[in-house]
Swiss-Prot record:
Its EC number is 4.2.1.9. Its cofactor is [2Fe-2S] cluster; Mg(2+). InterPro entries: Dihydro-acid_dehy_C, DihydroxyA_deHydtase, DiOHA_6PGluconate_deHydtase_CS, ILV_EDD_C, ILV_EDD_N, IlvD/EDD_N. Functions in the biosynthesis of branched-chain amino acids. Catalyzes the dehydration of (2R,3R)-2,3-dihydroxy-3-methylpentanoate (2,3-dihydroxy-3-methylvalerate) into 2-oxo-3-methylpentanoate (2-oxo-3-methylvalerate) and of (2R)-2,3-dihydroxy-3-methylbutanoate (2,3-dihydroxyisovalerate) into 2-oxo-3-methylbutanoate (2-oxoisovalerate), the penultimate precursor to L-isoleucine and L-valine, respectively. GO terms for biological process: isoleucine biosynthetic process; L-valine biosynthetic process. Binds 1 [2Fe-2S] cluster per subunit. This cluster acts as a Lewis acid cofactor. Homodimer. Pathway: Amino-acid biosynthesis; L-isoleucine biosynthesis; L-isoleucine from 2-oxobutanoate: step 3/4; Amino-acid biosynthesis; L-valine biosynthesis; L-valine from pyruvate: step 3/4. This is Dihydroxy-acid dehydratase. The modification N6-carboxylysine is found at residue 124. It comes from Burkholderia vietnamiensis (strain G4 / LMG 22486) (Burkholderia cepacia (strain R1808)). Pfam families: ILV_EDD_C (PF24877), ILVD_EDD_N (PF00920).
Amino acid sequence: MPTYRSKTSTAGRNMAGARSLWRATGMKDDDFSKPIIAVVNSFTQFVPGHVHLKDLGQLVAREIEAAGGVAKEFNTIAVDDGIAMGHDGMLYSLPSRDIIADSVEYMVNAHCADAMVCISNCDKITPGMLMAAMRLNIPVIFVSGGPMEAGKTRLANPVTKTIELKKLDLVDAMVIAADQSYSDADVAEVERSACPTCGSCSGMFTANSMNCLTEALGLSLPGNGTVVATHADREQLFKRAGRRIVELTRQYYEQDDVRVLPRSVGFNAFENAMTLDIAMGGSTNTILHLLAIAREAGIDFTMRDIDRLSRVVPQLCKVAPNTNKYHIEDVHRAGGIMAILGELDRAGRLHTDVPTVHAPTLKDALDQWDIVRTQDEAVRKFYLAGPAGVPTQIAFSQDTRWPSLDLDRAEGCIRSYEHAFSKEGGLAVLTGNIALDGCVVKTAGVDESILVFEGSAHVTESQDEAVENILNDKVKAGDVVIVRYEGPKGGPGMQEMLYPTSYIKSKGLGKACALLTDGRFSGGTSGLSIGHCSPEAAAGGAIGLVRDGDRIRIDIPNRTIDVLVSDEELARRREEQNAKGWKPAQPRPRKVSAALKAYAKLVMSADKGAVRDLSLLDD
């Protein structure tokens, strides 16, 4: 039988000093016989997805203590990718994932906590906490702050001149700002309307993608990824998480039930998560994060598995930025993640024998929570939770409900296998002589007319240079914009490229250009945007050998990407580049701190999840 970890600092005569300090935090005599559960919060006033979390840690703590545990809350950092984007602040975003994982490990191990409730929400916080959960392998439940409501405003269509009601998100603000056909007044109106409430940005961007994937991994409660942050129903997720973690903790330490440990989800749960991601056209960043989380779990889940799944999993859901018709709030109305998993199950694409934190198996969970098969009216009411359309930073501030569920599996937000948006899913892995270890593309956001594309390389060696060239009309129809030396090592930090892709769209080139980078993309990116090119330029990858004017051929159906240059010429260029060193031809006006240099020294390639190369730490 496992021993409670907390006994290390709470039991025995020699721990009198530690107990004295525990007492100074408010613990009483009878608390020393209870499990100590860490409430891992991520409140910050910098990030709309986290601005409402301040009191939610204590909400969970009260439920833990009512259920017989001792709750101790601490915070991690949280970077807002949207605010950090487009300048050197983005260098810190991906590295913050590892800092978050480390900080959770440090706090939980230093104080010998028995279990965790992780309160996450935005882009790097959920994956960082998931990495920590797998590393620590103690009972855990994830509960997110929830998605933002979609914005809405009335704008004049620049083509038809008619006034239209437009649903909005962050990406719309970026695209319209660079589109000269819209007036300054229009831009100001969109700016004020695009992000109306607290919560993670309202489309299927990275934050919401990752929060949805926690449901597929079996580590969060149903609705975690889709109930809007403002709705009263989300409060129940926090309360249930607080009560349930005490039960899971006792199952492990008092009944030796290892099924409640996060690593017990196994390889099949990672396949389920990736299958969901492909089916819903999630962010390409999820690939990076799932690879990293699997490595922390000691699970051999690789790009090969992702490539295999991408060829057979259909796309059953299409949400912004891949369409303006639906946002996360609409996914919830259609039954949320459990509904997508239910359709995947009926298509024979799901492992349903994996454990979850709220049901013995995923099959049991689907029997209750898939609205197509459930008989539970409370579940149906739960998925009617909708947006109120009232700007606010206050959680649980409204209880609006949709008039009806979206059960249309032929033309609705979530489709059945027979009516899939496409028979192949929303993400793909491409390989070729320019990306020997692979690169990724969100096919859900690519127009069918450019699934096969050949164009002329327009080479840039920083995101800033790419943005400048796009805005100054140096990028033309038929170009493949190369943005290199922006990978995990080369950036360092693997910047997101939402501004270049948004500006390509605003210039009317969204169906006429491609962009290839060893950096990565925001979950808000759409178009022929190919990232994670591995090996990266700074590690000697062939993307560093491409020259202006080289022809590049992209074939998504056949999963290939090649620079149309002979092997002999590439070998000659490689010798030349080896002599020069694998770095930008011209110095970049970029401040790289000691912290970022340390990150670059240890980080591995994107196809390995951009995690630390632990072999470098061996004696």
